[in-house]
C-alpha cells in the first residue's frame, strides 16, 4: 500500500469530519435529535392511531428526522471506525481489508453529499408532497401534444424517485396530448425537488402533425405548489368561495358523465380556480379541491413575501407563471435551462424523466 493512498484516505476522513461538524450546526442536529425523541414517544402512544391523519403526519416527521439524525450519527461513527481500520490494515499489510475501508469511506462520502444536497431545501414546505399544474399554451394540437409530453416527463420523474402520483384532473387535447392537467406527487421532499420547475417550457421540433414537416415552436406552462398539512395554517372564509359542480369529462369509464361529481372552486378575492374530477364522489372531489386551494393560497402568500427580495437580487430571473425557464430543441438534441445555463444533449432521457441535473443546478444556484 502506497503512503500517498493512505494519506489521501486519511485526508478524506478529515474532510468528512469537518463537513459533518458544519452540517450539524446548519441543520441544528441537537434540536432535531431532541425532537426525534419526542416524535418517537408520540408514535409509540396507542392513542395516536385513533387519529389516522395525525399518525400519518407523525410518521412522516419521524422519517425526515431519522434521515438527518441517524445519517449524521452513522457518519460520525464511520469516521472513527475507519480511522482505526486504516491503522490496523496498514500494520498488517492487509490490502483486501484496506480496499474494504476505501469502499466504506466512499459510502460515507455519498451519505454526506446527500445531506449537503438537502441543505438546499430551505423553505418550510420543501419536505411536503406537491401538486403540478400543466397547461398547454396557444397553438392547438402542437401545444397540447407538448403539454402531454411534459405530463409524461414529470410522471416518469416521480416514478424514478419512488414517488406516488395521482391524476386529479386531466382535460385531453382534441387530437393529441392534453389541454391541462393537475397531478399530485406524494413523496419525501417532492415539493423541494420540483418547485423550481415552475415556469414556461418551450419546445422546438419538426412537427409530426405537419404534412410539410415544418419546424414548430410550442409552449406549455408548469406550476408547482406544495400540499399544505396541518402544521401550516391557512384560513379560508367560506363566503369568499364560489363552488360549482359539473359532469366530469375525459377518461374514466362510462360512469363519469352520469352525475355532477366534478367540482370547481373559485376563490373570489384572488381569482384562483381549482377543480377536481378524479373521484366518483362529489364530496371527495370537493375535499381534494379544497386542499389544492389551500396549497395555491400558501404559494401565493410565499411569492408575495419573496417578491421584493427577488426584485433586488441581480441576475436572478423571475420564476413566476409567465417566465420562460427551459428550451427543448429536439432536432438539435439540446435542452437548456435559461436560468442556470445547465444544458444536456440526451433529449430522450430528459423527456423520460431524467431531470436530476436540471433540478440540482437550479437548487445550487438558488433559483
Swiss-Prot record:
Domain of life: Bacteria
SMART domains, per database record: PCRF
InterPro entries with a match to the protein in the record: PCRF, Pep_chain_release_fac_I, Pep_chain_release_fac_I_sf, PrfB
Chief subcellular location: cytoplasm
Residues that bear N5-methylglutamine: 254
Keywords, in A-Z order: Cytoplasm, Methylation, Protein biosynthesis
Post-translational events: Methylated by PrmC. Methylation increases the termination efficiency of RF2.
GO terms of molecular function: translation release factor activity, codon specific
Gene Ontology CC annotations of this record: cytoplasm
Localization terms from the record: Cytoplasm
Family: Belongs to the prokaryotic/mitochondrial release factor family.
Task of the protein: Peptide chain release factor 2 directs the termination of translation in response to the peptide chain termination codons UGA and UAA.
Name of the molecule in the record: Peptide chain release factor 2
Amino acid at each position: 500500500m502506497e503512503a500517498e493512498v493512505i494519506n489521501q484516505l486519511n485526508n478524506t476522513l478529515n474532510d468528512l469530519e469537518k463537513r459533518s461538524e458544519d452540517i450539524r450546526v446548519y441543520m441544528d442536529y441537537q434540536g432535531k435529535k431532541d425532537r426525534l425523541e419526542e416524535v418517537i414517544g408520540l408514535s409509540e402512544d396507542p392513542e395516536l392511531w385513533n387519529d389516522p391523519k395525525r399518525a400519518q403526519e407523525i410518521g412522516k416527521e419521524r422519517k425526515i428526522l431519522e434521515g438527518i439524525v441517524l445519517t449524521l450519527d452513522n457518519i460520525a461513527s464511520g469516521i472513527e471506525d475507519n480511522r482505526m481500520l486504516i491503522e490496523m490494515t496498514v500494520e498488517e499489510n492487509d490490502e483486501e481489508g484496506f480496499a474494504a475501508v476505501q469502499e466504506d469511506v466512499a459510502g460515507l462520502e455519498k451519505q454526506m453529499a446527500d445531506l449537503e444536497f438537502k441543505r438546499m431545501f430551505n423553505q418550510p414546505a420543501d419536505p411536503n408532497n406537491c401538486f403540478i399544474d400543466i397547461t398547454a399554451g396557444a397553438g392547438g394540437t402542437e401545444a397540447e401534444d407538448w403539454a402531454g409530453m411534459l405530463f409524461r416527463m414529470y410522471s416518469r420523474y416521480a416514478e424514478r424517485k419512488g414517488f406516488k402520483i395521482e391524476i386529479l384532473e386531466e382535460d385531453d387535447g382534441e387530437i393529441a396530448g392534453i389541454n391541462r392537467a393537475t397531478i399530485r406527487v406524494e413523496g419525501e421532499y417532492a415539493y423541494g425537488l420540483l418547485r423550481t420547475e415552475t415556469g414556461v417550457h418551450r419546445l422546438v421540433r419538426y412537427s409530426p402533425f405537419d404534412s410539410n414537416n415544418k419546424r414548430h415552436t410550442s409552449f406549455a406552462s408548469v406550476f408547482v405548489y406544495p400540499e399544505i398539512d396541518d402544521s401550516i395554517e391557512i384560513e379560508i372564509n367560506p363566503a369568499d368561495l364560489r363552488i360549482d359542480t359539473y359532469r366530469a369529462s375525459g377518461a374514466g369509464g362510462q360512469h363519469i358523465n352520469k352525475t355532477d361529481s366534478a367540482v370547481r372552486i373559485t376563490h373570489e378575492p384572488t381569482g384562483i380556480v381549482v377543480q377536481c374530477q378524479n373521484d366518483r364522489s362529489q364530496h371527495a372531489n370537493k375535499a381534494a379541491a379544497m386542499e389544492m386551494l389551500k396549497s395555491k393560497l400558501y404559494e401565493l402568500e410565499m411569492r408575495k413575501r419573496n417578491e421584493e427580495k427577488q426584485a433586488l437580487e441581480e441576475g436572478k430571473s423571475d420564476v413566476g407563471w409567465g417566465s420562460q425557464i427551459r428550451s427543448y430543441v429536439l432536432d438539435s438534441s439540446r435542452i437548456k435551462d435559461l436560468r442556470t445555463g445547465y444544458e444536456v444533449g440526451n433529449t430522450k432521457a430528459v423527456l423520460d424523466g431524467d431531470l436530476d441535473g436540471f433540478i440540482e443546478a437550479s437548487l445550487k444556484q438558488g433559483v
